[in-house]
Amino acid sequence: SSVDLPCVGDWVCVQYHDAESHASIHDVVPRRSFLRRKSPGKNIDFQMIAANIDVAFIVQSCHFDFNVRRLERYLVMVNEGHIEPVLLLTKTDLVSAAELELVLASIRAADITARIVTLSNVTGEGFDQVKALMLPGKTYCLLGSSGVGTTTLINLLLGKDALETGAVSGTGEGRHTTTRRHLVTLDNGALLIDMPGMRELGILSAGEGLDDSFAE
């Protein structure tokens, strides 16, 4: 089935041909964690998104994108796949301290217990906290809607403009620039996967993921 095919983050057994640029995949090493969602549309199958992730950074903008119901769905998906969630609230420079506190209060009201880091790609707030969380040999991913600043964050972590970023609109909303999944290696040996923004986020069975996502 399509679930058994390699996805980003998989470790595979390969046999190289005459040139090391060509190889055949013989097997996929069993996954220790995974990200999957319900296939778009009415299909009841699920789509494997990524594998072998240690920490998922769930990214939402404080300014235009924040939606606690969407955040809950991301948390269920991440916890179901045995991945540790960390919430990144971006664009804090575009909201007042009172507006930011309202966002944080809505998260607490939903009994969400995941770690939260507030970020601004303009002022650099929170960047060092994210960098300190990323350990050598571990794999991380960025999950969020289009335009919340994930590509800019990756470029900051890499220390260079390795990925294209979109112009920011007058509302502070970035334009969608990630069209495929990227896996990049940071200088310290941590691996980071950038995901395209998800227009549809469906969950098939939320039992275990639901239990792990919220306080009792």
Residue locations for each model-derived region?
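Short, charged beta-turn/beta-strand-edge "cap" motif at the junction between a beta-strand
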Residues: 16-21, 62-64
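Walker A/P-loop
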Residues: 146, 150-152, 156
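Conserved C-terminal guanine-recognition region of P-loop GTPase G domains, centered on the G4
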Residues: 43-116, 214-216
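Helix-rich effector regions associated with P-loop NTPase G domains
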Residues: 3-19, 29-55, 83-85, 92, ...
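Canonical P-loop GTPase G-domain recognition
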Residues: 93-148
